[in-house]
Every structure is written in C-alpha cells, then in structure tokens.
C-alpha cells in the first residue's frame, strides 16, 4: 500500500472562531483559547487505514522542549482528555479526516507551529500544517483566568471600546477610549511586546515557558507598555511639552499607538500619561484573553518613600515648594485591574489584581507595578507580592500640608486621613455609567475596621504596632520623626473658610469666585489673607502663577465676609495646560498665630455634542452631526474634528472646521459606514492651536445587514 500524506488542511476558522469567541480577530491564522478543543479537517492522499497512526507535534518559541512545556508530541486517542495536549478523531469520510485537538488549561499562550506525522507500515510522512495562536481562556473553569459571569466576559474581554474617568473628585468626566484589540495587526503586536521584553531577549526559551502563568505575563506587559527600561511602547511626559511627539490628550485609543510602535520598529511612541498607559495595557491584556478593566482613583497618592503619607510643603501664600515636596497627590490616577487566580498567594487573593504601567516607581529594578491583589490591599496584607505598599498608599495614605518658614522650621497647617483614595471608579458592565468600587479597596473611612487594617499595614511594613493613624514621617532633609499623635485633631479653629464659584468656570471666560471667611468666635479677629493661583497639570504640579495678592480682613464676632476674586482670561490663557485645571490657595493668618489653608481645584468647562442622524447598519452609510462652540471671545481658525471608532471607520478621519467667530456655535456633518454590528463607540475631538482639545463620544448601535 502506498504511503499516506496530507494534501490540504482546513482550519475551520468560522466554526472554531465562534466556539472560542475569537471570530473578531482578523488574523490569517486560526486563533483559539486554551483548555478547549478545536477542530481541523485534513484531506489525505488516500483513505486512512485503521492501523495507521497520526502523531501531532505542537511547538512554541525558540528551542521548544517537552521539559519546558513548550513542545508536545501526542497521537489520536479515544481516551478521555488527560493533563496534556490531546487529539481525537471526530469524523472520517473516504480521504477526509476531521480531528479534535485540545490544549491543557495551563498551556503556554502564544503562536504555535503544528506538524503531523503519519506512520504506515514502516513508511512515514511528515508535514507542517501551519501556525495558530493560543490565548488565555476566561470561559474555561480550569484556566487561572476563568471569569464566571458571561456579561463580565463580554465587557472585560470582548468589548473593544470603553470609558476612562478623569477630572477631580467633585467633577468626574468620562472620556471614550478605543481599545481596538481586534483591529489589524494588534494581536501580532501584542505577541511582539512579549518577545521584545528583556526577559525574552536574555533567555527566550525560559521566558516563553513562563507564559502559561497570568501573573508572569501581566507583570512583563506592565513593564513593556512604558519605555523606561526596555524600549517599550509608550514614553511618558508630564511637563506639558510635547515637541517631537503627540500630546497624551490627543490619543483617542490604543490602536494608533500600537501600530505606530510597530511601524517605527519598536521605537517608543511619544507621549503618554497615566490614562494612555492604562488604555494600552487594557488593549494588550484583553487581546491575549485576560479579563481587564480600567480603574480611576481620585486624589491618588504618590508616596515616594513608602511611609504611608503624602507630605506637602507650602510657603506663606500656599504655593507648593517643589524642591521640598517629594510626595504628591494627583487629582486622579488611572491603572488597570485584571481577573485571575493567585496560585502564589492562595485562593483568598484570587480575583481582581492591580496592574499599573505608568512609570512611577521601580519594582525589582524595573518600572512596573503589580499584580497586587485588591483583596490584599483591602485587608492590609501589603507584604504580599507584588508592590502592595505602593498601591495601598495610593488609596490609603494620610495627607499633610506643612508651612515652611524662612528659618527652615515647619508648621502643620492641614492634615486629613480621608482625603486620599476617593471615588475609585470604573465603567459599568453593559452601560456607560460610572461604578464606584472604593469599597473593594478599603473599608469605610474612619471606621474601626479601616483603622485596624491601617495598623496592620504599618506593622507589616515597619514591624511595629500603630497606636494612632501615623507612625513616622519624613522630615525635609531625609530625617525621620516618630509620632503617634501627628494626626490628632488640632485645637478648635477660630475661623473657617472656603472658595465659592460665582459663575460656571468656562474655558475662554474670566473666572469669578469668592473666598468666604467666617469668624467662629465671639471676639473680633484680624486675618491676613494671602491668595495664590496657578495653572496645574492633573498631577497638581504647578505650571505658572496667575494670582498673587494679599488682603487684610477684620471679622467681627460670628461675622462672615467674602473676598471677591476675578482672574481674567488673559491671565491664564497662555499657561493653561490641556488638563484645563487651575489650583487656588488661600493662606489665612490669624493675629494670634493660627493658620488656615483653603484650596480649590477648578476644571474649565467646554462644549461638544454628537448626533447620529438615522439608524446605523453594517455596510450602509449614515450621517453624523457634530456641534461645537468656540469657547473664546476671539475669532479662531485652523480647527479640525478628529474622528475615530473601531467597527465604524477604517482609519482616523480629519475634518476641517470653518473659521469660528467669538463664541459661535457651528455644526459639521460627515458620513460613516459601519463594518461591524453591535454597540460601537465613535470619538470626536475638536482640535485647535488656540485652546486645549474638546473631547466627546457617542455610542452607535449598529444593526446587522439585512
């Protein structure tokens, strides 16, 4: 009998794609998930004899070996699935054979080469069948990344767009983001990110063998999304100067960033800030099959010395002293959570894990963060891997402001144990709503349980019991002071103060506010009020001073007074950053030595609306109308709309906007032709050299073609 050979392979991409939830990947090769069988049909040179044997070989990575679990050799069997790779005959018709192949739920993920050996009466035929890609499988109960809820799998694995929350605690704004994990080349780029890592460059065989473990994979990608150590994807920039690159606020999604990294031969893409790093990390992990979401923390601590405190130093006008202040409190910070088991810690710590690709501090010599179990953070188990102290401080640190005197002494003028870690937010499953998940990270502020957890974290970090909220703090110059009573309430204040916004703060308009002071005593008091204001980045780093004035105020018994404040547009327009944020401070000096510091964050408003004029259907053009308003009291030209949306546009659109008169409202129409059904996010930005980008998005519900 003549030898047998394979003449053709049908990878059954449609059938396998539907079964594995991978039909959206546009790759030429098959994409499947581990721990689940997939089928392929072989056309043979003749009918297969019952005594003839099919032996399959799977290989991934360089120097693949069975010892490293990067190679598997197995033959068809009627037995039940074992722990390794298996193959079974599904159907046979003359010269056609359909086989079912299955990987173990702990298989290494990545690109595989599949080969077959047909043995017949001492005759052998070998053939490479081709390559396929194996991903993590949140649908497989035995996979470490298993997620039980189908609604959550749809949101956190398959949704290719989302919302990132930015702003300040009392003014949270939603920004659309195009994850685009199913766009052209994105899967290949995500696999390239793993292959470009230092671990792979140094020892590729060992690195690939570790890719069965989501803990390892997410930690590698957390480092590779930033460029600080490894020519990773995105280069950070927080100074407001973006020459030679793209402003972080100009990005509308991850696809353009990842494609630019590939086309630039892996040169870091300029520039990113926290939400950009988080958006890209979310794309990569969803693409590889790990359920991932973007999380925003408002009043987020950056505790450089891990003493669970943010110490801010100010002068007599309340201005931050940059040379003394090493810690910081960002208006918001954005990171990721991914869902998987912690085999290294135990089942109590399974579930959501914090990952942060923003390069803030080094972890084991590399700029990365996590995975840190959210449960471990809530319970104060900061000693557990990875980077628990840093994440715990981001949501739980104490906040103290010190007045720095000319004689280099300092005086505490403000302290708050509840200021850090507010309104921790993520997008709701299946809707655009904001969900507050603060209770996943910590017990209610001020509760007995919260105090116990804080004390536990201090003990884990410093090996001492905390009798109060605070154990030690860093002095300027690096010396430390042990204090258990540092955050005990100060003496009862004799005055109170707050800023009141008199008119909505609109971009392009003068700002009108008042400082409201109240005498809380039955005696008259004199107060010197030093006012300052500055444009700031979202990290609260000052950019330029726009207000500096002093007032002498006499307050009668129980009297209240207002100090009116006006900041003209001409004062701030040249120095306003794309964050559109201003910080006001009032240092109130009472005659008898008491100090009161009052601060106010202001975010300037803008306007854009987007309407889809009719039903949207795959393959049918539909008109979109965008209405914008020139926020300035001057004529502007050279404006454009930048439009992006996965499944709605093949590439970014740039649409010129006619010259806008002062505060003019104008509408622009354009057509889109959807290529995919379901809810799709269309992002539209008004871009101008005269003012920061004005961003908007709308969800377009696309019907299937009739």
Curated annotation (Swiss-Prot):
Q: What is its EC number?
A: 2.3.2.13
CC terms in the record's Gene Ontology section: cytoplasm
Where found, per UniProt?
Cytoplasm
- Identify which top EC class this enzyme belongs to: transferase
Which residues participate in Ca(2+) 1 binding?
223, 226, 228
Superkingdom to which the source organism belongs? Eukaryota
- Cross-referenced PROSITE patterns, in alphabetical order? TRANSGLUTAMINASES
Cofactor: how and how many bound: Binds up to 3 Ca(2+) cations per subunit.
**Effect noted on mutating residue 426 to N:** In SCA35; decreased protein stability
Q: Reaction(s) catalyzed by this protein?
A: L-glutaminyl-[protein] + L-lysyl-[protein] = [protein]-L-lysyl-N(6)-5-L-glutamyl-[protein] + NH4(+)
Q: Where does Ca(2+) 3 bind?
A: 396, 417, 445, 450
Q: Which Pfam families match?
A: Transglut_C, Transglut_core, Transglut_N
Residues noted as binding Ca(2+) 2 in the record, renumbered to the chain? 303, 305, 307, 309, 327
Q: Which UniProt keywords apply?
A: Acyltransferase, Calcium, Cytoplasm, Disease variant, Metal-binding, Neurodegeneration, Spinocerebellar ataxia, Transferase
Tied to what disorder? Spinocerebellar ataxia 35: A form of spinocerebellar ataxia, a clinically and genetically heterogeneous group of cerebellar disorders. Patients show progressive incoordination of gait and often poor coordination of hands, speech and eye movements, due to degeneration of the cerebellum with variable involvement of the brainstem and spinal cord. SCA35 patients commonly show upper limb involvement and torticollis. There is no cognitive impairment.
Function, as annotated: Catalyzes the cross-linking of proteins and the conjugation of polyamines to proteins.
Q: Hey, which family's this protein in?
A: Belongs to the transglutaminase superfamily. Transglutaminase family.
Q: What is this protein called?
A: Protein-glutamine gamma-glutamyltransferase 6
Q: Which gene encodes it?
A: TGM6
């Amino acid at each position: 009998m003549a030898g047998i050979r394979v003449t053709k392979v049908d990878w059954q991409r449609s059938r396998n794609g539907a079964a594995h939830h991978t039909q959206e990947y546009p790759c030429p090769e098959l994409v499947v998930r581990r721990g689940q069988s997939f089928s392929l049909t072989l056309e043979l040179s003749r009918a297969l004899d019952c005594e003839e044997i099919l032996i399959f070989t799977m290989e991934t990575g360089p120097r693949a070996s069975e010892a490293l679990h990067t190679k598997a050799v197995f033959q068809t069997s009627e037995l039940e699935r074992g722990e390794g790779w298996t193959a079974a005959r599904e159907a046979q018709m003359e010269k056609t054979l359909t086989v079912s192949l299955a990987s173990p739920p702990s298989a290494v993920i990545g690109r595989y080469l599949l080969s077959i050996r047909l043995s017949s009466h001492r005759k052998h035929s070998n053939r490479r069948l081709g390559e396929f890609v194996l991903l993590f499988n949140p649908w497989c109960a035995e996979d470490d990344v298993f997620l039980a809820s189908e609604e959550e799998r749809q949101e956190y694995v398959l949704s290719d767009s989302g919302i990132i929350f930015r702003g300040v605690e009392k003014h949270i704004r939603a920004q659309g983001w195009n994850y685009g994990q199913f766009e052209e080349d994105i899967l290949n780029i995500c696999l390239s990110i793993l292959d470009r890592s230092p671990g792979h460059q140094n020892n590729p065989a060992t690195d690939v063998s570790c890719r069965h473990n989501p803990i390892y994979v997410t930690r590698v990608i957390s480092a590779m999304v930033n460029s600080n150590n490894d020519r990773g994807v995105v280069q950070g920039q927080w100074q407001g100067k973006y020459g030679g690159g793209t402003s972080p606020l100009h990005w509308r999604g991850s696809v353009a960033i990842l494609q630019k990294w590939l086309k630039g031969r892996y040169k870091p893409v300029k520039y990113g800030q926290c939400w950009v790093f988080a958006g890209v990390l979310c794309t990569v992990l969803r693409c590889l099959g790990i359920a991932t979401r973007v999380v925003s923390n408002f009043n987020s601590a950056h505790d450089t010395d891990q003493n669970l405190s943010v110490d801010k130093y100010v002068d007599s006008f309340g201005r931050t002293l940059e040379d003394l202040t090493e810690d910081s409190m960002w208006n918001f910070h954005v990171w990721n959570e991914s869902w998987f088991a912690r085999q290294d810690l135990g089942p109590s710590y399974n579930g959501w894990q914090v990952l942060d690709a923003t390069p803030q501090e080094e972890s084991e010599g590399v700029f990365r963060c996590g995975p840190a179990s959210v449960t471990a953070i809530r319970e104060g188990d900061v000693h557990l891997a990875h980077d628990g102290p840093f994440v715990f401080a981001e949501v739980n640190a104490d906040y103290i402001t010190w007045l720095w005197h000319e004689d280099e002494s300092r005086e505490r003028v403000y302290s708050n144990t509840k200021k850090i870690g507010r309104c921790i937010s993520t997008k709701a499953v299946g809707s655009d709503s904001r969900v507050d998940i603060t209770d996943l990270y910590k017990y209610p502020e001020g509760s007995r349980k919260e105090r116990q957890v804080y004390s536990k974290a201090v003990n884990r970090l410093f090996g001492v019991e905390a009798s109060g909220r605070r154990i030690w703090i860093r002095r300027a110059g690096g010396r430390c002071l042990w204090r258990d009573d540092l955050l005990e309430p100060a003496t009862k204040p004799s005055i109170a103060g707050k800023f009141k916004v008199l008119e909505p703060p609109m971009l392009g308009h003068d700002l009108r506010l008042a400082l409201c002071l109240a005498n809380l005593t039955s005696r008259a008091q004199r107060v010197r009020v030093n006012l300052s204001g500055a444009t700031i980045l979202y990290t609260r780093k000052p950019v330029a001073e726009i207000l500096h004035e002093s007032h002498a105020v006499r307050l009668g018994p129980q009297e209240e007074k207002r100090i009116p404040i006006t900041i003209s547009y001409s004062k701030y327009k040249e120095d306003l950053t794309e964050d559109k944020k201003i910080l006001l401070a009032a240092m109130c000096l009472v005659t008898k030595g008491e100090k009161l510091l009052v601060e106010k964050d202001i975010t300037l408003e803008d306007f854009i609306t987007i309407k889809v004029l009719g039903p949207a259907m795959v393959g049918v053009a539909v008109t979109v109308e965008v209405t914008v308003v020139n926020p300035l009291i001057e004529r502007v030209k050279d404006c454009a709309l930048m439009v992006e949306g996965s499944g709605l546009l093949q590439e970014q659109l740039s649409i010129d906007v006619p010259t806008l008169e002062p505060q003019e409202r104008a509408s622009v129409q354009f057509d889109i032709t959807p290529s995919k059904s379901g809810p799709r996010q269309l992002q539209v930005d008004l871009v101008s050299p005269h003012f920061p980008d004005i961003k908007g998005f709308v969800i377009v519900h696309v019907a299937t073609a009739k």
